[in-house]
A protein has these predicted regions:
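Juxtamembrane intracellular "pre-TM" segments in multi-pass secondary transporters
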Residues: 2-14, 206-242
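Helix-to-loop junctions at the C-terminal end of transmembrane segments
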Residues: 70-84, 286-300, 384
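Structural signature of the two symmetry-related core transmembrane helices
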Residues: 87-102, 302-317
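Helix-loop boundary and gating motifs at the non-cytosolic
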Residues: 7-65, 237-269, 273-276
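Multi-pass alpha-helical transporter architecture, strongest
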Residues: 193-204, 395-414
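A membrane-interface helix-boundary motif in multi-pass transporters
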Residues: 50-52, 169-192, 382-401
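Glycine-rich segments within core transmembrane alpha-helices of 12-TM secondary carriers
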Residues: 147-169, 366-376
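Helix-loop junctions at membrane interfaces in 12-TM secondary transporters
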Residues: 103-116, 319-331
Length: 414
């Protein structure tokens, strides 16, 4: 019994790594909730319709993912060089934090979207290095548990600044400020939270797995990318997993990124939407921990397909979503599987790649994850514009989950 307890006791470095998830998840939650409302207010002031608002928001998200897809493998490969990972990670965090603050200074919708792209690219870039740090902060037989705890505490920890921000926005009139001013303050609060929770990791992290510094490090990083891509097909498990991940996580991230925009386009009550998404975070906390524990009894190759199938059901349900209570049901079910599919995918990948090339491989992982989500957002945006129905746009994501499920089963047999 004591040995089992010791096995799951977090080290100081593991706690610092998890704490960064608590910080950046606050930004993710803000992007999924208050930031779309801020943009909606600016869009209405600029004369955009609800369909145009949803479409432009989707196009901005797509721009972020294309930029991330271009930068991730380059930065990830460079970060595998000794003593490069932490400085580049720090730079990306700084870009995200500064961008988060700067969004509050925009007064029209177009500058706001441009700054949002800037901040989201910094955030996405930081995740390439953060995810690749997993092989440095823990050992393979603890990866599923540590990764799950990262997502779990990220979900519940992000609620702390969010509740403060939500109370500030909803109660703006009672404290004598406008709602737009309250939204500005919410952005500053979130940026400060993100920065403070990053500091322990910056103090404690040391790169363990690396390649030695060579002359012309940037040129060598491009050469290593080419070598990895040429030989990727030889590692069938990694190759087919990345193809599967490209599809299913694209749908997951699109649902996360566009949930509030989707509900707003359907005319749902704003307060109800925000509270429903808060419930998603709360439900995701114990659910991610449960999946972490289940990973000790069942392989991730069994648990991940269960999560993919659940998301296919979520997309199907979105076709018929019309009422506020249905959005609440959707929020709860998403929370049940969101943390599991993200955490298990990250740890599953970390276990099947060479640890000394974690940055390089996680650069590819990020392309197939955050960098590939342009496809999902484009499906939603184009589908909404062509049919005039947000339900059809979001429901069409079921195709990504079906294809992802099939490809994952192929990868798990390699």
């Amino acid at each position: 019994m004591n040995e089992a307890k010791q096995k799951f006791r977090l080290t100081g470095l593991e706690r610092a790594w998890i704490l960064y998830d608590v910080g950046n998840s606050a930004f993710v939650l803000l992007v999924a909730t208050l930031i779309p409302i801020f943009f909606n207010a600016l869009a209405e002031g600029g004369g955009l319709s609800s369909v145009e608002y949803l479409a432009y928001w989707g196009y901005a998200a797509s721009a972020v993912t294309v930029i991330t897809a271009v930068l991730s493998p380059i930065l990830g490969t460079l970060a595998d060089t000794r003593n490069f990972k932490k400085p580049i990670f720090t730079f990306c965090v700084a870009v995200g934090v500064i961008g988060c603050c700067a969004m509050g200074m925009a007064s029209t919708w177009l500058p706001f979207l441009l700054i949002f792209i800037f901040a989201k690219v910094g955030f996405s870039g930081s995740l390439v290095f953060y995810d690749s740090m997993l092989s440095d902060v823990t050992v393979p037989d603890r990866m599923d548990e540590v990764s799950s705890k990262g997502y779990a505490w990220g979900y519940i920890g992000s609620c702390v600044p969010f509740v403060v921000c939500l109370a500030l926005v909803l109660g703006a009139g009672s404290v004598g400020i406008s709602q737009m001013k309250a939204l500005n303050l919410a952005l500053f609060i979130t940026a400060a939270w993100w920065l403070v929770t990053t500091l322990p990791l910056l103090r404690q992290y040391k790169q363990v797995h690396f390649v030695e510094v060579q002359e012309h490090a940037i040129r060598q990083s491009f050469a290593r990318i080419g070598h990895t891509l040429r030989h990727l097909k030889e590692d069938r498990q990694v190759f087919w997993f990345l193809l599967a991940f490209f599809c299913y996580i694209d749908g997951v991230d699109t649902i996360i990124d566009m949930a509030t925009a989707y509900g707003t386009a359907l005319g749902r009550d704003t307060t109800g939407l925000l509270l429903a998404l808060l419930v998603t975070q709360i439900v995701a906390f114990p659910s991610a921990l449960v999946f972490g524990r289940l990973s000790g009894q069942y392989p991730s190759g069994t648990l991940i397909p269960v999560c993919i199938a659940a998301y296919a059901g979520i997309a199907l349900f979105a076709f018929f979503l019309k009422h506020q209570w249905q959005f609440w049901v959707l929020a709860v079910v998403v929370g049940m599987f969101q943390g599991g599919i993200q955490a298990l995918s990250r740890s599953h990948f970390a276990k099947i790649i060479p640890p000394e090339k974690s940055g390089e491989y996680f650069g590819l992982f990020d392309i197939c994850g955050k960098g590939a989500s342009f496809l999902g957002t484009m499906i939603v945006s184009v589908g909404s514009q062509l049919t005039g129905s947000a339900n059809v746009g979001v429901g069409s994501l079921i195709v990504l989950f079906i294809v992802g499920f099939v490809l994952f089963r192929v990868s798990d047999q390699k």
